[in-house]
Amino acid sequence: MTNEKVYEMKSSKVYPLLVNKALRKNRTKAEVDEIITWLTGYSQPELEELAESEISYGDFFRNAPELNENRTLIKGVVCGIRVENIEEPLMREIRYLDKLVDELAKGKTMGKILRKN
């Protein structure tokens, strides 16, 4: 899938996929929401509104109130690519979220996922 196709996807379509990935591994929607708010700076009410809106996934990240400065500590592979090596900034932000949800699904603690240690 090209970057542009990812950017044009509706957040209302992507958000349930992220939540379902966590739920399948006995994690919660609240944990996914905590990860998203930590990464993007959106408040919980803003996130809930955006999750049901027609905003594109690209604009969801472009308009993020405050991307967490510790997001650069996120390392590892998602979709076969090291997130820290992704050169296109918007795609890197999107893959950071993918990586964090992957870590949640793999059973990591929220403290480790949110780089609190």
Model-derived regions, located:
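A charge-rich, low-complexity, intrinsically flexible signal that marks solvent-exposed coils, linkers
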Residues: 1-117
